[in-house]
């Protein structure tokens, strides 16, 4: 009997070894270990995950396949992960075969408690209905105007005074935390018309904001542990699952009160025949005459919108300001562009008044080089560095890679912006000029499957234009007033999360910007090369010509 058991064990081990050797030959990418698959590599490289994935993709021509656990019957299905950054593969997944690559059950189960069947956590008809409904709102000028009001108010009354105080007291500030607070207030105001006041002197805590942060952190932890484990912890009430449950209760209570109050306000106005403007997203959904939405649906609309709009803009701006501190030439071009626009729109009689009000819509729209610098930041440091899809049915990607049903595909947005085959030999350099047309100085909208920072295809970010509006307004407000330097000894590194936060924040010192010196360097040229007209943006080596005033940045 013992001999039979021993022979059976030898047969199993031999069979597994032969299977493992065969599967190892066709898997490309990181080393795969017996049973453990690529998990040891993931653990070893966890502090530089995105760079590690990028290195593997470069070595494998833009696509590789690996298995998290090298177990028969799983390694080619649930355990198989295809990783790609090939633009043709991305277009295939995100557009051509969109229905074959949904969010999938893993993503939905992880975020269901927080986001329910909201637009960022749903597929199929549920997603399509919400997408169409939201798209109608995002195309309205009203929402853009509302965003502008919230952003400008936050900048003028809170954000800039906090920076000014820090400058006067020679105190460093964590710019990432401060911008995160500002964008949270802005997005909550736009989502449901409430001022959360997290970006205020003293940096006060807000119950809803704290609960939202805890709930997001607990939900993200579910990604890094097996499903059965977090399900068990939830059932037993252990660890962060306890925090998640309590935080969700606080969120539900807060939003229920907001929704109930808004319903009463709208009903009272309807009965009295009065009209008070409510241009937040929640009110616009509630005022639709053709639909009647449940409180749960409205709550999920607000939460999904906040999750999508808060972290992404703040993270992008943090990396933008860090890059600016290391590229003074780019900083100089941005400040000169801002000043050139303000010379035309506000004049030079009272330059000190330039900082009394944030830039308006028309002024922001003319900041072409600033938009290029922000886009270049997003290319190198996308707010969401990796995303994944579930494979519904067997398929073959354009590069010939077979992806079986039940497996998953991770597309690396981080790597997509760092490939020589897509962006050229200087792909790792911070070069805003790659976004500026050398012919007419206009902004170049690169193909969405090469530049995937705002996703692509049917799921492309609805709030892209609002995000640019907010980021450009905040960036212009800071750079017009201050010169930034990173605090000596402060280490800037990536935090391994679904969102590309800075692990230690961004500690900076602030110094007053000398606008008079910059304005003096802007020379009025009335030569044959300058004729009457409108601002023609940034031309060539950072030369911005404003044709109707004859002002050129030199």
UniProtKB/Swiss-Prot annotation:
It catalyses: an organic molecule + reduced [NADPH--hemoprotein reductase] + O2 = an alcohol + oxidized [NADPH--hemoprotein reductase] + H2O + H(+). Induction: By abscisic acid (ABA), auxin, the etylene precursor ACC and cold treatment. Down-regulated by wounding and in etiolated seedlings. GO terms for biological process: fatty acid metabolic process. Disulfide bonds: none annotated. Disruption phenotype: No visible phenotype under normal growth conditions, but mutant plants have reduced content of the flower polyesters 16-hydroxypalmitate, 10,16-dihydroxypalmitate and 1,16-hexadecanedioate. Its EC number is 1.14.14.1. The modification Phosphothreonine is found at residue 549. The chain crosses the membrane at residues 6-23. Its main location: membrane. Coiled coil: none annotated. It holds the Pfam family p450. GO terms for molecular function: alkane 1-monooxygenase activity; heme binding; iron ion binding; oxidoreductase activity, acting on paired donors, with incorporation or reduction of molecular oxygen, reduced flavin or flavoprotein as one donor, and incorporation of one atom of oxygen. It is a single-pass membrane protein. SUPFAM superfamilies: Cytochrome P450 (SSF48264). GO terms for cellular component: membrane. Its cofactor is heme. It is found in: Membrane. Heme binds at residue 461. Keywords: Heme, Iron, Membrane, Metal-binding, Monooxygenase, Oxidoreductase, Phosphoprotein, Transmembrane, Transmembrane helix. Expressed in stems, flowers and siliques. Catalyzes the omega-hydroxylation of various fatty acids (FA). Acts on saturated and unsaturated fatty acids with chain lengths from C12 to C18. Involved in the biosynthesis of 16-hydroxypalmitate. Belongs to the cytochrome P450 family. This is Cytochrome P450 86A4. It comes from Arabidopsis thaliana (Mouse-ear cress).
């Amino acid at each position: 009997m013992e001999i039979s058991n021993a022979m059976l064990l030898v047969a199993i081990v031999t069979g597994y070894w032969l299977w493992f050797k065969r599967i190892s030959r066709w898997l490309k990418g990181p080393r795969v270990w017996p049973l453990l698959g690529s998990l040891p590599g993931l653990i070893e490289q966890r502090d530089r995950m995105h760079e590690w994935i990028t290195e593997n993709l470069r070595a494998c021509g833009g696509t590789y396949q690996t298995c998290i656990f090298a177990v028969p019957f799983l390694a080619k299905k649930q355990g198989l992960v295809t990783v790609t950054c090939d633009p043709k593969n991305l277009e295939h997944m995100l557009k051509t075969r969109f229905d074959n690559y949904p969010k999938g059950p893993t993503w939905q189960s992880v975020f269901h408690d927080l986001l329910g069947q909201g637009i960022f956590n749903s597929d199929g008809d549920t997603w399509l209905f919400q997408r169409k409904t939201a798209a109608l709102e995002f195309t309205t000028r009203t929402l853009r105007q509302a965003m502008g009001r919230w952003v400008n108010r936050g900048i003028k009354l809170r954000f800039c005074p906090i920076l000014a105080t820090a400058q006067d007291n020679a105190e460093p500030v964590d710019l990432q935390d401060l911008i995160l607070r500002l964008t949270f207030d802005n997005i909550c105001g736009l989502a449901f018309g409430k001022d959360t006041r997290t970006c205020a002197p003293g940096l006060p805590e807000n119950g809803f904001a704290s609960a939202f942060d805890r709930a997001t952190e607990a939900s993200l932890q579910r990604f890094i542990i097996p499903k059965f484990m977090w399900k068990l912890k939830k059932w037993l009430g252990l660890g962060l699952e306890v925090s998640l449950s309590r935080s969700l209760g606080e969120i539900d209570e807060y939003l229920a009160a907001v929704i109930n109050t808004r319903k009463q306000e709208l009903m009272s106005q309807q009965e009295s025949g009065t009209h008070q403007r409510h241009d937040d997203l929640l009110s616009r959904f509630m005022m639709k005459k053709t639909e009647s939405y449940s409180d749960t649906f409205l709550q999920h609309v607000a939460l999904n919108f906040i999750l999508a709009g808060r972290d992404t803009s703040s993270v992008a701006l943090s990396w933008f300001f860090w890059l600016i501190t290391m590229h003074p030439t780019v900083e100089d071009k941005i400040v000169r562009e801002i000043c050139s626009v303000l010379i035309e729109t506000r004049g030079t009689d009272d330059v000190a008044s330039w900082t009394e009000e944030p830039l308006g819509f028309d002024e922001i729209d003319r900041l072409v080089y600033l938009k290029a610098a922000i886009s270049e930041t997003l290319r190198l440091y996308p707010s969401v560095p990796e995303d994944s899809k579930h494979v519904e049915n067997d398929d073959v990607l354009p590069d010939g890679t077979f992806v079986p049903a039940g497996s998953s595909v991770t597309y690396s947005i981080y790597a997509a912006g760092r490939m020589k085959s897509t962006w050229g030999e200087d792909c790792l350099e911070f070069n805003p000029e790659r976004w500026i047309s050398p012919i007419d100085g206009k902004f170049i909208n690169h193909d969405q499957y090469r530049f995937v920072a705002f996703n692509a295809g049917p799921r492309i970010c609805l709030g892209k234009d609002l995000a640019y509006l907010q980021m450009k307004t905040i960036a212009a407000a800071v750079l017009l007033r201050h010169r930034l330097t990173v605090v000596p000894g402060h280490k800037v590194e990536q935090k391994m999360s679904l969102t590309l936060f800075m692990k230690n924040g961004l500690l900076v010192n602030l110094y007053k910007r000398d606008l008079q010196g910059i304005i003096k360097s802007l020379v009025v040229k009335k030569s044959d090369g300058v004729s009457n007209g409108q601002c023609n943006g940034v031309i060539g080596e950072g030369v911005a010509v404003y044709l109707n005033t004859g002002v050129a940045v030199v």
